[in-house]
Curated annotation (Swiss-Prot):
Residues 1-21 are annotated as: Disordered. Belongs to the high-potential iron-sulfur protein (HiPIP) family. The keyword Glycoprotein does not apply. Keywords: 4Fe-4S, Electron transport, Iron, Iron-sulfur, Metal-binding, Transport. Residues 1-13 have a biased composition (Basic and acidic residues). Signal peptide: none annotated. It comes from Halorhodospira halophila. Specific class of high-redox-potential 4Fe-4S ferredoxins. Functions in anaerobic electron transport in most purple and in some other photosynthetic bacteria and in at least one genus (Paracoccus) of halophilic, denitrifying bacteria. It comes from the Bacteria. This is High-potential iron-sulfur protein isozyme 1. GO terms for molecular function: 4 iron, 4 sulfur cluster binding; electron transfer activity; metal ion binding. One of its GO terms (biological process) is aerobic electron transport chain. Homodimer. [4Fe-4S] cluster binds at C31, C34, C48, C64.
Length: 71
């Protein structure tokens, strides 16, 4: 499965620290603790359930601007 590149959608970055200048980013927000995180697949990459990411894997340490805290 292809892996998301920086800028794939919604200001996505593979390393959340790279989003530090984004107005929506808050420290500690990661794909792996987002409500859209689906499941880990391999080597720190996993599925995102947001429709704009359904064709690619995202990095657990990544971030995008539709981040929503998991409950």
């Amino acid at each position: 499965e292809p892996r998301a590149e920086d800028g794939h959608a919604h200001d996505y970055v593979n390393e959340a620290a790279d989003a530090s200048g984004h107005p929506r980013y808050q420290e500690g927000q990661l794909c792996e603790n987002c409500a859209f995180w689906g499941e880990a697949v391999q080597d720190g990459w996993g599925r995102c359930t947001h429709p704009d990411f359904d064709e690619v894997l995202v990095k657990a340490e990544g971030w995008c601007s539709v981040y929503a805290p998991a409950s």
